[in-house]
Amino acid sequence: MTSFEAQQETFDCSEYGNGSCPENERSLGVRAAMYSLMAGAIFITIFGNLVMIISISYFKQLHTPTNLLILSMAVTDFLLGFTIMPYSMVRSVENCWYFGLTFCKIHYSFDLMLSITSIFHLCSVAIDRFYAICHPLHYCTKMTIPVVKRLLLVCWSVPGAFAFGVVFSEAYADGIEGYDILVACSSSCPVMFNKLWGTTLFVAGFFTPSSMMVGIYGKIFAVSKKHARVIDNLPENQNNQMRKDKKAAKTLGIVMGVFLLCWFPCFFTILLDPFLNFSTPAILFDALTWFGYFNSTCNPLIYGFFYPWFRRALRYILLGKIFSSHFHNTNLFTQKETE
């Protein structure tokens, strides 16, 4: 994501410059360090989420409604790492967009779509955990595979329609003085939000779903506390299931918290920037964008830390065991984890 000031600093658009990139003031060592850090994040994002995708798709034991949502969220993070972060890395390090205006809009549309898609997925996961913990008797009838597929359709279609519609219609730039001049600069990537669409993006794309998530998880943990007081008096099989559901909710709650921590500064800056006459420093805007990207890097690390089955699946994938016939029926859970 770019800001208006970032474009002004990169190009002398007010005087219709020749569209060439300015000389990069960063030393070779600084650029090498930036490339190394960002490339490392990209590798972890792509590889980690690819492992999650393969694991849930391959092992039959993981074919549950909850994991179907997690699988789709991993696809979102994988696409961000594969299609968005590499081009953003070049732009951030070189201080220039080399890929043209049309691809700039496509890139930004996917960037915006995937970030909103992530939060929609987290809302869906929160709903899934709500029924599993707060209404366990109705979970199997409420969160069926067809219901999850409809949720996923909403998670992908609504952010996609919003992102591509707003960016390609250029409604986001209505009333921004100098925008047409920025477009005339061939090497710029002039995407910024006016007051109306900056507010709309923040409220509809971040604040509202985030508030819903926080409210749902608040209810989940309140119910979990009540369950903890009576859990010892329940039958063993019901006791074990409630413990597993609570642990899953805790892990996914951490995923939600990391997402909000990583993306709130960027979305909040998009909200404030037009009210501050687009005065956000370019380096700050870029740093906040990458802080948001790093959320997709963190997710597979969180899964690896909290889910032993993820680590086992990774080992099986690296050893090539998934190419053996019938290996997809392998049990990924130990006796202790199923109790």
Curated annotation (Swiss-Prot):
SUPFAM superfamilies: Family A G protein-coupled receptor-like (SSF81321). The keyword Transmembrane applies. Disulfide bonds join 21-185, 104-189. GO terms for molecular function: trace-amine receptor activity. Its main location: membrane. Keywords: Cell membrane, Disulfide bond, G-protein coupled receptor, Glycoprotein, Membrane, Receptor, Transducer, Transmembrane, Transmembrane helix. Residues 1-36, 89-106, 172-195, 273-287 are extracellular. SMART domains: 7TM_GPCR_Srsx (SM01381). One of its GO terms (cellular component) is plasma membrane. Residues 58-67, 128-150, 217-251, 311-339 are cytoplasmic. One of its GO terms (biological process) is G protein-coupled receptor signaling pathway. It is a multi-pass membrane protein. Glycans are attached at residues 18, 277. The chain crosses the membrane at residues 37-57, 68-88, 107-127, 151-171, 196-216, 252-272, 288-310. The keyword Membrane applies. It comes from the Eukaryota. It is found in: Cell membrane. Orphan olfactory receptor specific for trace amines. Trace amine compounds are enriched in animal body fluids and act on trace amine-associated receptors (TAARs) to elicit both intraspecific and interspecific innate behaviors. Ligand-binding causes a conformation change that triggers signaling via the G(s)-class of G-proteins which activate adenylate cyclase. May also be required to provide olfactory input into limbic brain areas to regulate emotional behaviors likely via modulation of the dopamine system. Belongs to the G-protein coupled receptor 1 family. In addition to the well known disulfide bond common to G-protein coupled receptor 1 family, trace amine-associated receptors (TAARs) contain an unique disulfide bond (Cys-21-Cys-185) connecting the N-terminus to the extracellular Loop 2 (ECL2), which is required for agonist-induced receptor activation. This is Trace amine-associated receptor 2. It comes from Rattus norvegicus.
